[in-house]
Regions:
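Intrinsically disordered, low-complexity segments enriched in small/flexible residues
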Residues: 23-31, 279, 283-291, 317-320
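Acidic, divalent-metal-coordinating active-site segment for phosphoryl/phosphodiester hydrolysis
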Residues: 213-219
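Glycine- (often His-adjacent) and acidic-residue-rich active-site loop
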Residues: 81, 89-139, 155, 268
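Conserved CoA-thioester-binding segment of acyl-CoA-metabolizing enzymes
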Residues: 1-6, 18-106, 320
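CoA-thioester-processing core
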Residues: 136-142, 150, 156-208, 223, ...
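C-terminal long alpha-helix characteristic of the crotonase
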Residues: 170-175, 217, 226-273, 278, ...
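Intrinsically disordered, low-complexity repeat/linker tracts enriched for polar/charged residues
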Residues: 1-25, 297, 301-313
Length: 320
């Protein structure tokens, strides 16, 4: 993909979507992404979710300018056609220090080892002021539907900042996550300096940001940086299961909840009341509540055959 063409497309999408608000109905579904046009992301798109796999395994999925362009294209599509996004990384085929044939080495899990250092070394003041990575990650964080990051192995530098932009993070026992930028003479300027304070608390955030602390999976789980740990071979199934639970909710209610959650404290409770006013007028609210009442009435009239169903609904969080 050509970077300049991509940015022109992004501007067109932004101008087209800029006036939409969360209460408006979605337009008819746009055509699906042309997965073959992407070179650094592997795209699998379904009806309610899209899986994007970072795919530069020879450099441990380092984030380069092309990947940033493709993340913008991905965001433009999901802004126009809201779906749950699952992010993951291709296993590494990096030959390592021994120079062995990548095909002969065992493939190790990796989400993203950071920004492409060769490109980063050559960037100058004007590149920093453009916010190359931060703009893309912030756009991803503001997508209408939730973003799930499935983290296996190294999740460092820009890779960690991409993960912090997600709404949910799942990991594997091989997870190693941190921000080593200060050791390279720069700062993590794509979101870690302000997102980590909220995610991990000030004390741990400073250890990660100022002292280069790298957390393993259990530490990341204990501090809430990931919500679940799964064996590597089960990670994507777990991400899909989470996406399925989200997809079972009303899409508009999910989208509005995500937007309201991100509002500053001083916007509440007024913004909550306005959001609820939108949802109170939606057909989905009436339909879903009527279906709930119908199920409850059926259980009350004939409770025995519905005992197993009651147990399943209680497990899923539904109550009568």
């Amino acid at each position: 993909m050509n970077g300049h063409d991509q940015h022109d497309q992004h501007d067109q999408h932004d101008q087209h979507d800029g006036g939409r608000d969360a209460g408006q109905r979605d337009e008819p579904a746009a055509p699906r992404l042309d997965a073959a046009a992407f070179t650094t992301l592997r795209i699998t798109e379904g009806e309610d979710r899209l899986h994007a796999r970072l795919d530069r395994p020879e450099v441990r999925n380092a984030i380069d300018a092309t990947m940033i362009d493709e993340l913008h294209a991905l965001c433009a599509h999901l802004e126009h056609t809201p779906k749950i996004l699952i992010l993951s990384g291709s296993p590494s085929t990096d030959s390592g220090a021994d120079g062995a044939d990548p095909e002969a080495r065992p493939r190790r899990g990796v989400f993203a080892s950071g920004a492409d250092i060769a490109q980063l070394r050559d960037r100058r003041r004007q590149d920093a002021l453009r916010g190359v990575n931060s703009t893309a990650f912030d756009r991803l964080a503001k997508l209408p539907m939730p973003v799930i990051a499935a983290l296996d192995g190294h999740t460092l530098g820009g890779g960690a900042e991409l993960a912090w932009a997600a709404d949910f993070r799942l990991g594997t026992p091989a997870l190693r996550v941190g921000q080593p930028e200060t050791g390279l003479g720069i700062i993590p300027a794509a979101g870690a300096l302000w997102r980590l304070r909220d995610l991990a608390g000030e004390a741990l955030a400073k250890e990660i940001l100022l002292a280069g602390r790298i957390l393993d999976a259990e530490e990341a789980l204990a501090h809430g940086l990931v919500s679940e740990i799964h064996p590597s071979q089960e990670l994507l199934d777990a991400a899909d299961a989470l996406a399925g639970r989200i997809a079972a909710q009303d899409p508009l209610a999910v989208r509005i909840s995500k937007q309201v959650f991100a509002m500053p404290r001083e916007a509440h409770p007024q913004v909550d009341n306005l959001a609820q006013a939108i949802l109170f007028e939606s057909e989905a609210k009436v339909d879903r509540m009527q279906a709930f009442l119908d199920r409850r009435e059926a259980r009350q009239q004939d409770p025995e055959p519905n005992r197993e169903q009651n147990r399943e609904q209680t497990t899923s969080g539904e109550t009568a």
